[in-house]
Amino acid sequence: MLALAAYLILPNLLSKKEETSNNALDQAMNNKTVYSFTKQGELTFSDAKGNFITNIDIEIADTPEKRETGLMFRDKMEQNQGMLFLFSTEEPQAFWMHNTVLPLDIIYVNSKMEVVHIAKNAKPYDDTSLPSVKPAQYVVEVNAGFSDKYGIKNGDKIVWRTE
């Protein structure tokens, strides 16, 4: 019975997600929407012992709409900028690069503010799912190569403040 319900409901949910994404793309292309970075806070990376690594200015994606759009359609982002995605619970996450122009490092962070996985050099426009591997409550997107440049790895920590 559960399998039948999933069979009937899942295709409908997937088609709605596709419709939303296509509508957002159509709207952005028709309106020639230009997205620019808006600093909403600052995020600091530190190693597992608390030693400072680096910090970045962040935009915050804390609503379903902001999380769905993320960094889509952006054609530039400075090296000291990124986006922090906030989720209400820690659970497996998965991101994709649909309509995302810039190559990114996608940093998954658990509820203890520890990096649990990094999807490095995610390819622009790629619809392949990039899973968190372990449960995550936060996700930080930065330019591709950022993690390697600063040596960010699993076990490192983040902390942020809003403006």
Residue ranges and their predicted role:
Residues 1-2:
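Hydrophobic H-region at the start of alpha-helical membrane spans
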Residues 6-163:
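Compact, glycine-rich, soluble single-domain proteins
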